[in-house]
Amino acid sequence: MLLIPAIDLKDGHCVRLKQGEMDDATVFSEDPAAMARHWIEQGARRLHLVDLNGAFAGKPKNGAAIRSIVDEVGDDIPVQLGGGVRDLDTIEHYLDNGISYIIIGTAAVKNPGFLHDACGAFPGHIIVGLDARDGKVAVDGWSKMTGHDVVDLAKKYEDYGVEAVIYTDIGRDGMLSGVNVEATVRLAQALRIPVIASGGIASIADIDALCAVEAEGIMGAITGRAIYEGALDFAVAQARADELNGGEG
C-alpha cells in the first residue's frame, strides 16, 4: 500500500488546514520543493499536491510552487495534483509539465460532462476526489454539502474511466482522529477501480487497519498533518505498510 504525503499549497507555502478552513492554516514550510525532496528521501513513492488557493478560486494559483516541486522531483516518483482544475486546457498544461495524475473534485460533481471529457482526452491520468461527510458529498472546498451519495457518484465516475478515487472523510481530515476504515472499505467494495483513503490518519494503528483491508481495493492512503506534526513517522509507516503487504504496492 502506498503512503502518500500531502503537500498543500497556500500562497506558495506548504500548509495544513484544519477542517478545510483557509484562515485556519499552519505553515509547515516556505520551501515546498525542499519538502517534496524530504518525503522522497523518507521513502515516498508518490506525492499528493493540492493548490488550495486554486481550489477556492476555481483556477490555478500556485504555479511557481508547483513548478518548483516538479523540477525537484523530476522522474523520481509520480505526482498527483488537485485544486482549481476546471477545464481541459489546465489538465493538458499540467500533464505536459511533469504532473502524472490530475485530481478533479468539485468540477466532477458540478459538471460531470467535464469529467467524462477529461477521462476521454487523458485516459489513465484522471483521478476523482470525493469529499464526504456521513456518506454525502461536499463541494467547493467543503463549504457546501450536496445530497449526492458518495458510492452512487463514484460508480458513475468509474464508468467514465477514472483511474482511481480519492475518498476524504471530511469529519476527520486534519483532526488526527483516526481514518474511517469502514466507510473507505464500503466505497472500495462497490468499485472495480482503486480507492485512495484520505482524512484522519493519525498513527501506525491506522496504517495497520488500512493494510488489513487493502485487498478490498484500497491502493494507498494520503497523510498530511500527522507526518508534519510528528504523530506519524513517514518512513516507519511506509516500511510497516510494505512489511504487512509483502513489498511495494
Curated annotation (Swiss-Prot):
Catalytic activity as recorded in UniProt: 1-(5-phospho-beta-D-ribosyl)-5-[(5-phospho-beta-D-ribosylamino)methylideneamino]imidazole-4-carboxamide = 5-[(5-phospho-1-deoxy-D-ribulos-1-ylimino)methylamino]-1-(5-phospho-beta-D-ribosyl)imidazole-4-carboxamide
Enzyme Commission number(s) from the entry: 5.3.1.16
Coiled-coil zones: none
Recorded metabolic or biological pathway in which this protein acts: Amino-acid biosynthesis; L-histidine biosynthesis; L-histidine from 5-phospho-alpha-D-ribose 1-diphosphate: step 4/9
An example Gene Ontology molecular-function term: 1-(5-phosphoribosyl)-5-[(5-phosphoribosylamino)methylideneamino]imidazole-4-carboxamide isomerase activity
One CC-aspect GO term: cytoplasm
Gene Ontology BP term (one): L-tryptophan biosynthetic process
Cellular compartments annotated: Cytoplasm
Keyword annotations: Amino-acid biosynthesis, Cytoplasm, Histidine biosynthesis, Isomerase
Highest rank taxon of the organism: Bacteria
InterPro entries registered for this protein in UniProt: Aldolase_TIM, His_biosynth, HisA_bact_arch, Isoase_HisA-like, Isoase_HisA-like_bact, RibuloseP-bd_barrel
Active-site residues annotated for this sequence: 8, 131
Sequence similarity: Belongs to the HisA/HisF family.
Protein name (record): 1-(5-phosphoribosyl)-5-[(5-phosphoribosylamino)methylideneamino] imidazole-4-carboxamide isomerase
